[in-house]
Protein backbone atom coordinates (compact mmCIF):
# COMPACT_ATOMS: atom_id res chain seq x y z
CA UNK A 1 0.00 0.00 0.00
CA UNK A 2 2.84 2.38 0.77
CA UNK A 3 4.37 1.73 -2.61
CA UNK A 4 1.12 2.54 -4.35
CA UNK A 5 0.80 5.77 -2.38
CA UNK A 6 4.26 6.93 -3.41
CA UNK A 7 3.64 6.15 -7.04
CA UNK A 8 0.33 7.95 -7.11
CA UNK A 9 1.95 11.31 -6.17
CA UNK A 10 2.78 13.80 -8.94
CA UNK A 11 6.52 13.75 -8.92
CA UNK A 12 8.79 15.24 -11.63
CA UNK A 13 11.06 12.25 -11.27
CA UNK A 14 8.48 9.82 -12.67
CA UNK A 15 6.77 11.47 -15.68
CA UNK A 16 3.67 10.00 -17.08
CA UNK A 17 1.45 7.60 -15.32
CA UNK A 18 3.21 6.35 -12.24
CA UNK A 19 1.46 3.00 -11.83
CA UNK A 20 2.15 0.57 -14.61
CA UNK A 21 -0.65 -1.49 -15.84
CA UNK A 22 1.06 -4.71 -14.74
CA UNK A 23 1.08 -3.69 -11.09
CA UNK A 24 -2.62 -3.41 -10.80
CA UNK A 25 -4.42 -5.64 -8.44
CA UNK A 26 -7.49 -6.05 -10.59
CA UNK A 27 -8.28 -8.98 -12.82
CA UNK A 28 -7.10 -7.04 -15.89
CA UNK A 29 -3.49 -7.39 -14.74
CA UNK A 30 -3.52 -11.19 -15.24
CA UNK A 31 -4.86 -11.40 -18.78
CA UNK A 32 -8.26 -12.49 -19.94
CA UNK A 33 -10.47 -14.26 -17.44
CA UNK A 34 -10.41 -18.07 -17.27
CA UNK A 35 -13.21 -19.97 -18.89
CA UNK A 36 -15.85 -21.36 -16.56
CA UNK A 37 -15.26 -24.94 -15.32
CA UNK A 38 -16.83 -27.75 -17.24
CA UNK A 39 -19.72 -29.53 -15.67
CA UNK A 40 -18.68 -32.56 -13.56
CA UNK A 41 -18.46 -35.88 -15.38
CA UNK A 42 -19.93 -37.71 -12.44
CA UNK A 43 -22.72 -35.63 -10.97
CA UNK A 44 -23.06 -37.89 -7.93
CA UNK A 45 -19.39 -37.34 -6.98
CA UNK A 46 -18.62 -33.67 -7.48
CA UNK A 47 -15.33 -33.86 -5.55
CA UNK A 48 -13.78 -36.12 -8.21
CA UNK A 49 -14.60 -33.88 -11.12
CA UNK A 50 -11.01 -32.77 -11.54
CA UNK A 51 -9.74 -36.34 -12.03
CA UNK A 52 -8.98 -37.10 -15.61
CA UNK A 53 -10.41 -40.30 -17.04
CA UNK A 54 -8.02 -43.25 -17.37
CA UNK A 55 -6.61 -43.91 -20.81
CA UNK A 56 -8.11 -46.75 -22.74
CA UNK A 57 -6.08 -50.02 -22.62
CA UNK A 58 -4.34 -51.20 -25.77
CA UNK A 59 -6.29 -53.44 -28.02
CA UNK A 60 -3.80 -56.36 -27.95
CA UNK A 61 -0.74 -57.30 -25.83
CA UNK A 62 2.53 -57.87 -27.66
CA UNK A 63 4.23 -61.28 -27.44
CA UNK A 64 7.00 -61.15 -24.73
CA UNK A 65 9.07 -63.89 -26.40
CA UNK A 66 9.64 -64.62 -30.08
CA UNK A 67 8.01 -67.55 -31.70
CA UNK A 68 9.86 -70.89 -31.45
CA UNK A 69 12.27 -71.65 -34.20
CA UNK A 70 11.64 -74.40 -36.65
CA UNK A 71 15.07 -75.98 -36.17
CA UNK A 72 14.23 -76.96 -32.56
CA UNK A 73 11.28 -78.99 -33.71
CA UNK A 74 13.38 -80.56 -36.45
CA UNK A 75 16.19 -81.51 -34.04
CA UNK A 76 14.15 -82.90 -31.16
CA UNK A 77 10.97 -83.83 -32.91
CA UNK A 78 7.46 -83.05 -31.78
CA UNK A 79 6.69 -83.61 -28.13
CA UNK A 80 4.44 -86.38 -26.88
CA UNK A 81 0.81 -85.56 -27.23
CA UNK A 82 -1.11 -85.35 -23.97
CA UNK A 83 -3.81 -88.00 -23.74
CA UNK A 84 -7.29 -86.61 -23.85
CA UNK A 85 -9.05 -87.10 -20.55
CA UNK A 86 -12.52 -88.49 -20.70
CA UNK A 87 -15.31 -86.59 -18.91
CA UNK A 88 -16.05 -89.59 -16.74
CA UNK A 89 -12.49 -89.80 -15.39
CA UNK A 90 -12.42 -86.06 -14.65
CA UNK A 91 -15.69 -86.17 -12.81
CA UNK A 92 -15.07 -88.85 -10.18
CA UNK A 93 -12.42 -91.39 -9.19
CA UNK A 94 -8.63 -91.17 -8.78
CA UNK A 95 -6.40 -90.50 -11.79
CA UNK A 96 -4.92 -93.52 -13.59
CA UNK A 97 -1.36 -92.78 -12.36
CA UNK A 98 -2.39 -93.00 -8.70
CA UNK A 99 -3.97 -96.42 -8.73
CA UNK A 100 -4.07 -98.08 -5.30
CA UNK A 101 -1.22 -100.52 -4.64
CA UNK A 102 -2.37 -104.00 -3.62
CA UNK A 103 -1.46 -104.84 -0.02
CA UNK A 104 1.09 -107.65 0.43
CA UNK A 105 -0.27 -110.90 1.83
CA UNK A 106 0.15 -111.31 5.56
CA UNK A 107 2.70 -113.80 6.87
CA UNK A 108 1.29 -117.17 7.64
CA UNK A 109 2.11 -119.35 10.64
CA UNK A 110 4.92 -121.06 8.75
CA UNK A 111 6.72 -117.78 8.06
CA UNK A 112 6.49 -116.68 11.68
CA UNK A 113 7.99 -119.91 12.95
CA UNK A 114 10.91 -119.70 10.52
CA UNK A 115 13.97 -117.99 12.13
CA UNK A 116 15.84 -115.15 10.52
CA UNK A 117 18.47 -116.21 8.05
CA UNK A 118 16.80 -119.58 7.41
CA UNK A 119 16.86 -121.49 4.16
CA UNK A 120 13.89 -119.53 2.83
CA UNK A 121 15.57 -116.11 3.24
CA UNK A 122 17.30 -114.95 0.04
CA UNK A 123 20.94 -114.11 0.64
CA UNK A 124 23.06 -111.51 -1.08
CA UNK A 125 25.75 -112.52 -3.63
CA UNK A 126 28.51 -111.58 -1.14
CA UNK A 127 27.06 -113.86 1.53
CA UNK A 128 26.86 -116.75 -0.94
CA UNK A 129 30.52 -116.39 -1.83
CA UNK A 130 31.80 -116.08 1.75
CA UNK A 131 30.26 -117.09 5.04
CA UNK A 132 30.33 -114.48 7.86
CA UNK A 133 32.40 -116.62 10.26
CA UNK A 134 34.80 -118.24 7.84
CA UNK A 135 37.93 -117.05 9.69
CA UNK A 136 36.62 -118.46 12.96
CA UNK A 137 35.90 -121.82 11.39
CA UNK A 138 39.44 -121.99 10.03
CA UNK A 139 40.93 -121.37 13.47
CA UNK A 140 38.67 -123.98 15.08
CA UNK A 141 39.52 -126.53 12.41
CA UNK A 142 43.22 -125.85 12.85
CA UNK A 143 43.02 -126.15 16.64
CA UNK A 144 41.05 -129.39 16.85
CA UNK A 145 41.48 -132.90 15.61
CA UNK A 146 44.76 -134.03 17.16
CA UNK A 147 46.60 -130.69 16.82
CA UNK A 148 48.29 -129.09 19.82
CA UNK A 149 45.94 -126.11 19.60
CA UNK A 150 48.61 -123.42 19.15
CA UNK A 151 47.97 -121.14 16.21
CA UNK A 152 51.12 -120.00 14.47
CA UNK A 153 51.31 -117.50 11.66
CA UNK A 154 53.26 -118.00 8.49
CA UNK A 155 56.09 -115.69 9.57
CA UNK A 156 56.79 -117.70 12.75
CA UNK A 157 57.42 -121.04 11.09
CA UNK A 158 61.01 -122.27 11.12
CA UNK A 159 62.91 -121.89 7.90
CA UNK A 160 64.26 -125.19 6.58
CA UNK A 161 67.73 -124.70 5.11
CA UNK A 162 69.15 -127.01 2.47
CA UNK A 163 72.44 -128.88 2.89
CA UNK A 164 74.23 -126.51 0.55
CA UNK A 165 72.96 -123.46 2.45
CA UNK A 166 73.97 -124.88 5.82
CA UNK A 167 77.44 -125.77 4.49
CA UNK A 168 78.06 -122.28 3.17
CA UNK A 169 76.76 -120.71 6.38
CA UNK A 170 78.96 -122.96 8.50
CA UNK A 171 82.01 -122.00 6.42
CA UNK A 172 81.28 -118.33 6.95
CA UNK A 173 80.69 -118.88 10.67
CA UNK A 174 84.04 -120.70 10.94
CA UNK A 175 85.86 -117.62 9.63
CA UNK A 176 83.87 -115.02 11.57
CA UNK A 177 81.35 -115.38 14.37
CA UNK A 178 79.82 -111.99 13.53
CA UNK A 179 79.09 -111.43 9.85
CA UNK A 180 79.45 -107.98 8.32
CA UNK A 181 76.67 -106.14 6.51
CA UNK A 182 78.39 -106.40 3.13
CA UNK A 183 79.13 -110.10 3.49
CA UNK A 184 75.61 -110.73 4.74
CA UNK A 185 74.07 -109.20 1.61
CA UNK A 186 76.45 -111.14 -0.66
CA UNK A 187 75.78 -114.44 1.09
CA UNK A 188 72.01 -113.89 1.02
CA UNK A 189 72.12 -113.19 -2.73
CA UNK A 190 74.24 -116.26 -3.46
CA UNK A 191 72.18 -118.67 -1.35
CA UNK A 192 68.74 -117.32 -2.27
CA UNK A 193 67.93 -116.16 1.26
CA UNK A 194 67.01 -112.87 2.80
CA UNK A 195 69.39 -110.85 4.94
CA UNK A 196 67.09 -111.33 7.91
CA UNK A 197 67.26 -115.12 7.56
CA UNK A 198 71.07 -115.00 7.42
CA UNK A 199 71.19 -112.75 10.49
CA UNK A 200 68.85 -115.02 12.47
CA UNK A 201 70.88 -118.09 11.51
CA UNK A 202 74.09 -116.51 12.85
CA UNK A 203 72.32 -115.51 16.08
CA UNK A 204 71.04 -119.04 16.63
CA UNK A 205 74.45 -120.48 15.75
CA UNK A 206 76.22 -118.30 18.33
CA UNK A 207 73.67 -119.26 21.00
CA UNK A 208 74.18 -122.93 20.18
CA UNK A 209 77.95 -122.57 20.43
CA UNK A 210 77.72 -120.92 23.85
CA UNK A 211 75.48 -123.71 25.07
CA UNK A 212 77.88 -126.41 23.84
CA UNK A 213 80.93 -124.72 25.38
CA UNK A 214 79.17 -124.38 28.72
CA UNK A 215 78.26 -128.04 28.72
CA UNK A 216 81.87 -129.06 27.94
CA UNK A 217 83.18 -126.97 30.79
CA UNK A 218 80.81 -128.61 33.23
CA UNK A 219 81.88 -132.08 32.09
CA UNK A 220 85.61 -131.34 32.38
CA UNK A 221 85.46 -130.03 35.95
CA UNK A 222 85.62 -132.89 38.59
CA UNK A 223 83.06 -132.90 41.40
CA UNK A 224 84.35 -130.84 44.33
CA UNK A 225 84.48 -132.52 47.79
CA UNK A 226 82.35 -131.01 50.52
CA UNK A 227 84.11 -128.34 52.58
CA UNK A 228 84.59 -128.29 56.38
CA UNK A 229 81.82 -125.82 56.78
CA UNK A 230 79.38 -128.22 55.20
CA UNK A 231 80.25 -131.05 57.65
CA UNK A 232 78.52 -130.54 61.05
CA UNK A 233 79.45 -132.82 64.02
CA UNK A 234 76.50 -134.38 65.80
CA UNK A 235 76.90 -134.43 69.64
CA UNK A 236 76.79 -137.88 71.35
CA UNK A 237 73.88 -138.59 73.58
CA UNK A 238 74.72 -139.08 77.31
CA UNK A 239 74.08 -142.51 78.83
CA UNK A 240 71.34 -143.13 81.30
CA UNK A 241 73.91 -143.98 84.05
CA UNK A 242 75.67 -140.68 83.63
CA UNK A 243 72.50 -138.80 84.28
CA UNK A 244 71.68 -140.73 87.55
CA UNK A 245 74.79 -142.60 88.85
CA UNK A 246 73.14 -143.53 92.19
CA UNK A 247 70.30 -145.36 90.53
CA UNK A 248 72.39 -147.64 88.36
CA UNK A 249 72.65 -150.35 91.06
CA UNK A 250 68.97 -150.23 91.65
CA UNK A 251 68.22 -150.65 87.99
CA UNK A 252 70.62 -153.62 87.74
CA UNK A 253 69.40 -155.51 90.86
CA UNK A 254 65.74 -154.72 90.61
CA UNK A 255 63.49 -157.62 89.80
CA UNK A 256 59.87 -157.63 88.99
CA UNK A 257 57.57 -158.28 91.93
CA UNK A 258 54.54 -160.50 91.54
CA UNK A 259 51.30 -158.65 91.78
CA UNK A 260 48.28 -160.40 93.17
CA UNK A 261 45.03 -159.57 91.60
CA UNK A 262 42.08 -159.77 93.94
CA UNK A 263 38.54 -159.55 92.71
CA UNK A 264 35.84 -158.62 95.16
CA UNK A 265 32.65 -160.68 95.01
UniProtKB/Swiss-Prot annotation:
Residue ranges, annotated region (Disordered): 9-152, 206-265
Any Pfam family: Caudal_act
Regions of compositional bias (Basic residues) in chain numbering: 206-217
Superkingdom per UniProt: Eukaryota
InterPro entries the record matches: Caudal_activation_dom, Caudal_homeobox, HD, HD_metazoa, Homeobox_CS, Homeodomain-like_sf, HTH_motif
DNA-binding region (UniProt annotation): 154-213
GO terms, molecular function: DNA-binding transcription factor activity; DNA-binding transcription factor activity, RNA polymerase II-specific; methyl-CpG binding; RNA polymerase II transcription regulatory region sequence-specific DNA binding; transcription cis-regulatory region binding
Biased amino acid composition, Pro residues: 30-43, 93-108
Keyword annotations of the record: Activator, Developmental protein, DNA-binding, Homeobox, Nucleus, Transcription, Transcription regulation
Cross-referenced SUPFAM superfamilies: Homeodomain-like
Region (Interaction with DNA): 157-178
Ranges of Low complexity composition bias in the record: 73-92, 110-126
GO cellular component: nucleus
A Gene Ontology BP annotation from the UniProt entry: anterior/posterior axis specification
Region ranges (Interaction with 5-mCpG DNA): 196-207
Skewed-composition ranges (Polar residues): 245-256
Location in the cell: Nucleus
Function: Plays a role in transcriptional regulation. Involved in activated KRAS-mediated transcriptional activation of PRKD1 in colorectal cancer (CRC) cells. Binds to the PRKD1 promoter in colorectal cancer (CRC) cells. Could play a role in the terminal differentiation of the intestine. Binds preferentially to methylated DNA.
Assigned protein family: Belongs to the Caudal homeobox family.
Entry protein name: Homeobox protein CDX-1
Species the sequence originates in: Pongo pygmaeus (Bornean orangutan)
Lineage summary: Eukaryota, Metazoa, Chordata, Craniata, Vertebrata
Gene name in the database record: CDX1
Amino acid sequence: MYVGYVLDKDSPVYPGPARPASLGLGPQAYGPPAPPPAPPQYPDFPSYSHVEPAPAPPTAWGAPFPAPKDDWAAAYGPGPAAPAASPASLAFGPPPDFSPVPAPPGPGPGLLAQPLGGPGTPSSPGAQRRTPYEWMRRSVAAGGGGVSGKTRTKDKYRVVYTDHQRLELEKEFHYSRYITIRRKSELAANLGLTERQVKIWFQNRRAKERKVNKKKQQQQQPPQPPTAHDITATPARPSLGGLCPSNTSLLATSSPMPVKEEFLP
